């Protein structure tokens, strides 16, 4: 009985303390709501609110990104504050959120000068200290340069073209036997096999299957609530990261023990760099494996999903790719000129990247008090350049939530389009952007010319923190005769 009374007293005391904290916070918020705009104007901060204690407005952001209207979080605040730049509180940090394309362009172009990359600690724990999102300064520029060199146009044209087609054909051969597949899961494994070959010179094998299995837990952790308790999705992801790093470390040791064996991959290039430690190499390789397969595999899935819901676009895609087959005299290897001739396919790719929003935005931290347009952002504040908000903005894209690849027919050169940033920008522009486009185009060509399909589930995507389909887009395949 005494124990029960003691427990009740503890619970009661905790409840009173919590209510007291909430009361103090509520009073502060009432005062803040009366004066926040005046204070922000004095500091030249945008208008806004920090939301609830601890969680801020993270839940509102999460709810929006898991709905079929991912821009709702932005829309609500743009109306409330009459501004497309506002103050919020996300993932434990006060932040300036921007859906203004000019503001975002300035943030991206001034990486290293006024801003530096800043991501939530839970994500950084998965990426590691030396993933490309985590490093700064000279090391970031060096690692980014190595990745760009690996994926230069000459390699895409003469190496990747053939390797991608071989892998896609061999993968689709296995799909024929299955009849029914979850496209999202199959694309993940296929693209991960491609990246494993380019980064670690690994062909599909038991080793790559083990890596793929570990990447399931690793990737799930990236899109999970970061609760580090035994058995949680996040904890499993951290364990998967540990095992993946161990595998890469063992490969490094094996390369050093057998220097006479020649490999043509990124790991060989990194081992030639005396200034790069093994720890940096492991984190860098793991990040590229993750980033290199995530965008491409998800884009493949979403492209097929969008085409499935738009018969007119699918018919035009079939016509374009059937014409390529006819000109080549059947299912022969595509060459670079064939790829460059896929005009409507590029429209489909652009629209898939716009509507799929595979890189929602970038987090940056101010290195000093920084003036952007009419805002003065204090040193140490987080800035979230919400790139996908522009992609889904009715001001820039008519019927923005509708899949309409024809909107790109007169605007296929998107290299200088600040309203379209699927691969980020500035010094951290994704080094694999051209590879992702090539992979997607070749996959679409082979898939569409070989198969008819029937979708087995109707589901809307979730966009938090990365776009995905919870059921994996299950489908039944039929050989196309």
Swiss-Prot record:
Write out the GO MF terms.
abieta-7,13-dien-18-ol hydroxylase activity; heme binding; iron ion binding
Functional summary from the UniProt entry: Multifunctional and multisubstrate cytochrome P450 that oxidizes the respective carbon 18 of abietadienol, abietadienal, levopimaradienol, isopimara-7,15-dienol, isopimara-7,15-dienal, dehydroabietadienol, and dehydroabietadienal.
Q: What induces it?
A: By methyl jasmonate.
PANTHER family membership: CYTOCHROME P450 26 (PTHR24286), CYTOCHROME P450 SUPERFAMILY PROTEIN (PTHR24286:SF232)
EC number(s): the record gives 1.14.14.145
Q: Where does this protein hold heme? A: 430
A Pfam family reported for this protein in Swiss-Prot or TrEMBL: p450
- Membrane-crossing segments per the record: 2-22
Where it sits in the cell: the answer is:
Membrane
Tissue specificity of this protein: Expressed in young tissues such as flushing buds and green bark tissues. Lower levels in mature needles and bark.
Record InterPro entries = Cyt_P450, Cyt_P450_CS, Cyt_P450_E_grp-I, Cyt_P450_sf
Name of the protein in question: Abietadienol/abietadienal oxidase
Q: Which PROSITE patterns match?
A: CYTOCHROME_P450 (PS00086)
**Where is it found, in Gene Ontology cellular component terms?**
membrane
Q: Which UniProt keywords apply?
A: Heme, Iron, Membrane, Metal-binding, Monooxygenase, Oxidoreductase, Transmembrane, Transmembrane helix
The membrane topology term of the UniProt record is: Single-pass membrane protein
EC main group? oxidoreductase
Please report the organism this UniProt entry assigns to the protein.
Pinus taeda (Loblolly pine)
Q: Fetch the Gene3D superfamilies from UniProt.
A: Cytochrome P450
- pH and activity: Optimum pH is7.5-7.6.
GO biological process terms, semicolon-separated: brassinosteroid biosynthetic process; brassinosteroid homeostasis; sterol metabolic process
